[in-house]
């Protein structure tokens, strides 16, 4: 008997299957920042248009942003969060408002 692998064995040495270690991708909060110039109605419109909030939810978030300085609009994957930030900032500029939207890791 030798310690060499059996050349006649078509399957070769027994190999244990590696278990993939998958983890969830990081999520990001999309945040609106308060300013003294953007009308409250415009902020509500943005929340309805880009974050699919109903009027009541949008008003609550807008008031939170107004009183606390910033508020979370939603939590998304990185690509979705980046897209929403870009859409909101572009839309605000088109309408000549200084509203600023950012993202931060959740």
UniProtKB/Swiss-Prot annotation:
Quote any Pfam family the record assigns.
ClpS
Family membership: Belongs to the ClpS family.
Quick one: a GO biological-process term for this protein?
proteolysis
The protein depicted here goes by the name: ATP-dependent Clp protease adapter protein ClpS
Q: Quaternary arrangement and interactors, per the entry? A: Binds to the N-terminal domain of the chaperone ClpA.
Chain segments carrying region Disordered: 1-22
According to its UniProt entry, what is the function of this protein?
Involved in the modulation of the specificity of the ClpAP-mediated ATP-dependent protein degradation.
Q: Which organism is it from?
A: Halorhodospira halophila (strain DSM 244 / SL1)
InterPro entries tied to this protein: ClpS, ClpS_core, Ribosomal_bL12_C/ClpS-like
On the tree of life, the source organism's domain of life is: Bacteria
